[in-house]
């Protein structure tokens, strides 16, 4: 944003130097990148009037001029500009004048003719990069007045780099508000005249997509003076704001934008067919823009259209098919509020940049449109004449930003900054910003935010404003004063830490994978589940939220196995996402897998592949470390697991997870030539609320008894163990181990032989043979009743 110091002083009468103002604005968060003079350094250049001209006798391109400088005698000037003519007010560099670039004007003869000065162009005075002919001044310019004084050239432009949240400062008015509150000065309100309609002409405005444009104001002005030109004072202010002059009506639009912050647009009324429609584009529609670029629209681009065609990309750039030109006599003025979300990104998508889009995508004041339209009307009528129609306003209150009001806790200023600022000082600073304090209760302010401050939404925003205006330099380094309370670690966090350390100690590598997974892989593993689809995925291979931990682990395993890793031991702790009746639920899980050769090369033993029992044994050790006693592995089927090598894991009577070998069908699909053993558990099922108690080691002897029997093949060792544990008195059974399983010759086809070893011990006395024999007899009888076992001798 480029801001003229003199223009700014019309709104707030400050006395700061350029350096002081730049430093003050920068410290307040409006970073000033540069401060530049508005014109080059020159002296003795005055306003003059060309009285008469005649051709140079010896040069076709030179003209002899008599120039009035409000002295006794006119001066003789030789000029080479094509636009010099009698009656023209010009900029005359007198003899002795110094111009930018080091040029000094002296009396001289050009082709034999006396020249007592030089008629200057805007380029020669450093007022423009390019210009044609000499500078033409207003007919009312006072002859003899110093040009610097007449054009107020002893001015500087501040180039301010605004942060995205400060959309309110994209205008002279916005910056003036800041300067006023920073210096505790009143803002000089510039009255806006309400122009009464002279004609009844209007256009119908249809807000077809009012969510994108909730307010649209317009006005017709007829019978413009085609000879009118933009006044020099306005052209100068536009130049200082970084905008070139084009046409009186267009220049007024840009001037109001710089002054008030409301971007506007003017259409040639003769090129509008019937009505104004604010709608989204139709895919394939084409529009030639004002810069000559032709764009193909789509249904994400908001356009201003008439009955038959688009006229402009809303809030970004107008179309050439409705542009105001030199012969335009009737215009339709637009002043609208566009939803920032609608405009944001569209300009960049099309490679466009405009002052309008820059303001609209950051947010303009939603209450400014009619005021800006009245201001523009007043200026156009004063410059180009014409007859104005009534203001047309269409709006949809449902989509207009509402008034922001909330209860501000002033104690947060000290909590967040450490500064103790008096309540009255806070109140003055907030009111200086235009914040209305409706009510004060203790340390609370009930506040209403002005409509132009779209960035103020909560307590923290007001704290920032207060400290910004109070002065960041008043923030002193000081020790933090706060109470420190040790954080509590949840049971789930403790379990996760324990499990992670335990698996790492067992030689497993922890993986961390995306929560987004490949739909093809996930659906192969969990075909019965519903999955949460991502609306905007990183890629099509990461377009679903994981419903289990296996997809990420298997993907990591495949990656490593294809890179000559002969042994893979992975585990991962993470969150999975279940869809239950359309509701998304999260749960924490631990999962792991084994694949490849167990152990390193060793001369004393041959290598073997990991199997189901390696992983089961690791899990049993984990459960023992967590003091989980009620754990069962119940043979069951899972779509992703081998039908004969899979089991549910039941902890404390509740289903908690799965263990098994990857289904051969999936191993083939993933091009794996070795078994993959994997498990998954709900992390919360590992939480054991029982507090472990100290128990001394028994000093009494242990007694071992072995049993061998035939049992149906479908009976598992765990079922047998459960019956035995329920039969043995109290806690005599210290260990239960299966040391032999045999199926084959000498055993019926539907049977298997199982041999188990039991260790019995009492903690308070020595067990006698009679007690042991009674216990063994009870076990055998119970097993015979439950499973029809046949005891082997």
Curated annotation (Swiss-Prot):
Annotated FDX-ACB domain residues: 698-792
Keyword tags: Aminoacyl-tRNA synthetase, ATP-binding, Cytoplasm, Ligase, Magnesium, Metal-binding, Nucleotide-binding, Protein biosynthesis, RNA-binding, tRNA-binding
Superkingdom, natural source: Bacteria
Gene3D superfamilies for this protein: 3.30.56.10, Bira Bifunctional Protein, Domain 2, Ferrodoxin-fold anticodon-binding domain, Nucleic acid-binding proteins, Phenylalanyl-trna Synthetase, Chain B, domain 3
Cofactor dependency: Mg(2+)
Any one Gene Ontology cellular component term annotated for this protein: phenylalanine-tRNA ligase complex
InterPro entries cross-referenced by the UniProt entry: aa-tRNA-synth_II/BPL/LPL, B3/B4_tRNA-bd, DNA-bd_dom_put_sf, Fdx_antiC-bd, Fdx_antiC-bd_sf, NA-bd_OB-fold, Phe-tRNA-ligase_IIc_bsu, Phe-tRNA-ligase_IIc_bsu_bact
SMART domains with a match to the protein in the record: B3_4, B5, FDX-ACB
Details of cofactor binding: Binds 2 magnesium ions per tetramer.
Taxonomic placement: Bacteria, Pseudomonadati, Pseudomonadota, Gammaproteobacteria, Legionellales
Domain B5, residue spans: 401-477
PANTHER family in the record: PHENYLALANINE--TRNA LIGASE BETA SUBUNIT, PHENYLALANYL-TRNA SYNTHETASE BETA CHAIN AND LEUCINE-RICH REPEAT-CONTAINING PROTEIN 47
GO BP: phenylalanyl-tRNA aminoacylation
Compartment list: Cytoplasm
Family (UniProt): Belongs to the phenylalanyl-tRNA synthetase beta subunit family. Type 1 subfamily.
Catalytic activity: tRNA(Phe) + L-phenylalanine + ATP = L-phenylalanyl-tRNA(Phe) + AMP + diphosphate + H(+)
Protein name, UniProt field: Phenylalanine--tRNA ligase beta subunit
The protein's assembly and partners: Tetramer of two alpha and two beta subunits.
Positions that bind Mg(2+): 455, 461, 464-465
């Amino acid at each position: 944003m480029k801001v003229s110091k003199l223009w700014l002083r019309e709104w707030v009468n400050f006395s700061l130097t350029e350096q002081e103002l730049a430093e003050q604005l920068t410290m307040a968060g409006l970073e000033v990148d540069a401060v530049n003079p508005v014109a080059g350094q020159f002296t003795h250049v005055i306003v003059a009037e060309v009285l008469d001209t005649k051709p140079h006798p010896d040069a076709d391109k030179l003209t002899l001029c008599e120039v009035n400088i409000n002295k006794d005698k006119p001066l003789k000037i030789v000029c080479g500009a094509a636009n010099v003519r009698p009656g023209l007010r010009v900029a005359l560099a007198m003899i002795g004048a110094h111009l930018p670039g080091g040029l000094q004007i002296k009396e001289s003869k050009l082709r034999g003719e006396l020249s007592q000065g030089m008629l200057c162009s805007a380029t020669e005075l450093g007022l423009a990069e390019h210009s044609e002919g000499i500078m033409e001044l207003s007919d009312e310019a006072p002859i003899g007045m110093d040009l610097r004084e007449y054009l107020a050239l002893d001015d500087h432009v501040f180039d301010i780099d605004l942060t995205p949240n400060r959309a309110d400062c994209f205008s002279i008015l916005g910056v003036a508000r800041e300067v006023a509150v920073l210096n505790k000065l009143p803002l000089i309100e510039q009255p806006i005249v309400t122009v009464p309609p002279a004609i009844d002409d209007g256009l119908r405005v249809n807000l077809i997509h009012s969510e994108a444009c909730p307010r649209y104001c317009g006005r017709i002005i007829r019978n413009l003076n085609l000879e009118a030109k933009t006044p020099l004072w306005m052209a100068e202010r536009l130049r200082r704001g970084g905008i070139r002059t084009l046409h009186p009506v267009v220049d007024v639009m840009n001037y109001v934008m710089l002054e008030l912050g409301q971007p506007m647009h003017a259409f040639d009324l003769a090129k509008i067919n019937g009505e104004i429609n604010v709608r989204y584009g139709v895919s394939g529609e084409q529009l030639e823009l004002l810069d000559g670029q032709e764009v193909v629209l789509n249904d994400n681009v908001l356009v201003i259209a008439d009955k038959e065609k688009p006229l402009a990309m809303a809030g970004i750039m107008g179309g050439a098919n409705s542009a105001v030109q030199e012969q335009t006599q009737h215009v339709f003025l637009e002043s609208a509020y566009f939803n920032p979300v609608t405009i944001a990104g569209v300009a960049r998508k099309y490679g466009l940049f405009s002052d309008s889009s820059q303001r609209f995508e950051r947010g303009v004041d939603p209450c400014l449109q009619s005021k800006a339209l009245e201001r523009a009307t007043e200026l156009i009528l004063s410059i180009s004449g014409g007859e104005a129609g009534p203001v047309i306003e269409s709006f949809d209150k449902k989509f207009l930003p509402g008034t922001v009001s909330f209860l501000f806790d002033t104690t947060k200023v000290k909590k967040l900054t450490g500064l103790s600022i008096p309540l009255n000082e806070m109140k003055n600073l907030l009111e200086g910003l235009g914040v209305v304090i409706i009510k004060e209760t203790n340390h609370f302010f009930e506040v209403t935010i002005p409509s132009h401050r779209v960035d103020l939404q909560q307590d923290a925003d007001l704290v920032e404003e207060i400290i910004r205006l109070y002065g960041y330099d008043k923030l002193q380094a000081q020790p933090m004063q706060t109470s420190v309370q040790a954080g509590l670690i949840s049971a789930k966090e403790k379990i996760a830490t324990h499990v992670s350390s335990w698996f790492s100690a067992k030689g497993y590598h922890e993986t961390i994978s995306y929560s987004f997974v490949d739909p093809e892989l996930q659906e192969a593993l969990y075909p019965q589940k519903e999955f949460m689809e991502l609306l905007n995925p990183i890629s099509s291979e990461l377009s679903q939220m994981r419903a289990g931990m296996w997809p990420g682990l298997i993907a990591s395993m495949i990656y490593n196995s294809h890179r000559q890793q002969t042994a893979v031991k992975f585990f991962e702790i993470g969150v999975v996402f279940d869809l239950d009746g359309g509701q998304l639920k999260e749960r924490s899980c631990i999962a792991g897998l084994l694949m490849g050769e167990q152990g390193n090369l060793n001369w004393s033993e041959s290598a073997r592949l990991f199997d189901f029992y390696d992983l089961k044994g690791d899990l049993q050790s984990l459960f023992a470390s967590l003091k989980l006693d009620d754990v069962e592995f119940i043979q069951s089927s899972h779509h992703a697991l081998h039908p004969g090598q899979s089991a549910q894991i039941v902890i404390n009577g509740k289903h908690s997870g799965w263990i098994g070998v990857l289904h051969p069908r999936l191993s083939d699909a993933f091009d794996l030539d070795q078994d993959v053993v994997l498990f998954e558990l709900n992390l919360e099922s590992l939480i054991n609320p029982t507090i472990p108690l100290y128990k001394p080691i028994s000093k009494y002897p242990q007694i071992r008894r072995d049993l061998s029997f035939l049992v149906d093949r479908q009976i598992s060792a765990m079922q047998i163990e459960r019956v035995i544990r329920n039969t043995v008195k109290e806690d005599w059974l210290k260990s239960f181990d299966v040391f032999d399983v045999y199926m084959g010759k000498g055993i019926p086809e539907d049977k298997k032989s199982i041999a188990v070893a039991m260790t019995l011990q009492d903690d308070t006395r020595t067990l006698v043979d009679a007690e042991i024999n009674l216990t063994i007899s009870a076990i055998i009888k119970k097993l015979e009743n439950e499973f029809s076992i046949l005891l082997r001798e």
